[in-house]
A protein has these predicted regions:
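Short non-domain terminal segments
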Residues: 3-4, 16, 75
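Hydrophobic small-molecule pocket/channel-lining residues, especially in calycin-type beta-barrels
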Residues: 23-185
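Bacterial N-terminal signal peptides that target proteins for export
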Residues: 1-10
Length: 185
């Protein structure tokens, strides 16, 4: 009798474990998959709008603005559930970013388009299709504001849009720019 009871208990445990594993692995219908931005991307200057007006408002010099609007850049993205690392390279240019995808605010001292990012908060949009990084910045003229960088995939994941929105405190309007990056195979 004891042997039969142990077999029955073992069978019950197995059923419970396998049922739990299948339930845990099943995708949750109310949480769509987040796009995977990992890969190597090349900036398409012709398809992009110029970042020059945005950089000018930030206070970037003429040489910086000219370089940014005419240089082909390559970016390598590595994404995990918690972190996105971006290594952007070009002739005489390197920018490494680490974005924490859990919505926390991260202190920073990063130079972005001529401004200094003081802190950054990165989170997925409500529909989990866009990654939004909000940088609290200080311009070269000492003005405060936000540089919002939104990244999302288009063209069946073969291209990425990087949209910039500059909101400076006490400025009546925002400045926008959009870059198109194509996946390298």
């Amino acid at each position: 009798m004891r042997y039969l009871l142990l077999r029955w208990l073992a069978a019950l445990v197995c059923v419970g474990v396998f049922s739990l594993a299948q339930t845990s692995a099943a995708p949750k219908p109310d949480q769509p998959d987040k796009p995977n931005l990992s890969g190597t991307w090349m900036l398409d200057l012709k398809a992009s709008t110029s970042v020059e007006p945005l950089m000018k408002q930030i206070g970037a010099g003429l040489l910086e603005r000219t370089y940014a609007t005419s240089t082909k850049l390559k970016a390598t993205f590595h994404q995990t559930e918690q972190v996105l690392t971006i290594a952007t390279r070009g002739p005489s240019f390197a920018l490494d970013e680490t974005l924490y995808l859990d919505g926390r605010t991260d202190p920073s001292n990063q130079q972005l388009l001529g401004a200094t990012a003081l802190k950054t908060r990165t989170a997925w949009s409500e529909d989990h299709k866009q990654l939004v990084a909000t940088h609290q910045i200080k311009t070269k003229q000492g003005k405060g504001g936000q540089l919002i960088i939104t990244r999302y995939l288009i063209n069946e994941g073969k291209s990425m849009v990087v949209a910039f929105t500059l909101k400076l405190n006490a400025e009546p309007s925002n400045t926008f720019a959009r870059q198109i990056w194509n996946m390298q195979t």
